[in-house]
Amino acid sequence: MRLKHFKTFLFITMAIIVIGTGCANKKKKKDEYNKPAIFWYQGILREILFANLETADNYYSSLQSEHINSPLVPEAMLALGQAHMKKKEYVLASFYFDEYIKRFGTKDNVDYLTFLKLQSHYYAFKNHSKDQEFISNSIVSLGEFIEKYPNSRYRPYVEYMQIKFILGQNELNRAIANVYKKRHKPEGVKRYLERIDETLEKETKPKPSHMPWYVLIFDW
């Protein structure tokens, strides 16, 4: 009987705490507007520190809408871009870097910012290893960087990423050719094998990508 009363008491206590916390949060959210830029910026950094990136993104939206010309806006963009990349949220990382380039890019920083954007694509590569369009677009963007910023300190890193993407494209083309081979379509086999960069293959001698056995069973 005592146990039953204790459970009832515990349930009521927890309910009061939940309701009280909810009310406090609502009041807190209600009061969070028309704040100085530093308030939102510090909130962004705090939420990044605790890996609450969704809240950090919301704080950025408030900073952006209430203080569009604040010098803290570009700082927040960079911080959020790097935080999302660290958390492997590469699409969001690329978004922040791209927005920074469009709004605050200068001849002194645009190569670095473009490099960060390309780096987010590179890290996202394993999630898009069978996305022909993603790979092709990334190779083009990497080539444009090399052409546009031949003397950039980041060029060697971009060239490395470009090689990795081309090798990935080679592997994808070989896999697609194999599909056509299984379907007895020699024209398709020929078309995709011709797209392989044989020179790069000979120079780098890449190892096939590791693929778990449970993926291999259903692959292609």
From Swiss-Prot:
<keyword id="KW-0998">Cell outer membrane</keyword>
<dbReference type="GO" id="GO:0051205">
    <property type="term" value="P:protein insertion into membrane"/>
</dbReference>
<comment type="subunit">
    <text>Part of the Bam complex.</text>
</comment>
<dbReference type="InterPro" id="IPR017689">
    <property type="entry name" value="BamD"/>
</dbReference>
<keyword id="KW-0564">Palmitate</keyword>
<protein>
    <recommendedName>
        <fullName>Outer membrane protein assembly factor BamD</fullName>
    </recommendedName>
</protein>
<dbReference type="InterPro" id="IPR011990">
    <property type="entry name" value="TPR-like_helical_dom_sf"/>
</dbReference>
<feature type="lipid moiety-binding region" description="N-palmitoyl cysteine">
    <location>
        <position position="23"/>
    </location>
</feature>
<keyword id="KW-0449">Lipoprotein</keyword>
<dbReference type="GO" id="GO:1990063">
    <property type="term" value="C:Bam protein complex"/>
</dbReference>
<dbReference type="InterPro" id="IPR039565">
    <property type="entry name" value="BamD-like"/>
</dbReference>
<feature type="signal peptide">
    <location>
        <begin position="1"/>
        <end position="22"/>
    </location>
</feature>
<feature type="lipid moiety-binding region" description="S-diacylglycerol cysteine">
    <location>
        <position position="23"/>
    </location>
</feature>
<comment type="similarity">
    <text>Belongs to the BamD family.</text>
</comment>
<keyword id="KW-0732">Signal</keyword>
<comment type="function">
    <text>Part of the outer membrane protein assembly complex, which is involved in assembly and insertion of beta-barrel proteins into the outer membrane.</text>
</comment>
<keyword id="KW-0472">Membrane</keyword>
<dbReference type="Pfam" id="PF13525">
    <property type="entry name" value="YfiO"/>
</dbReference>
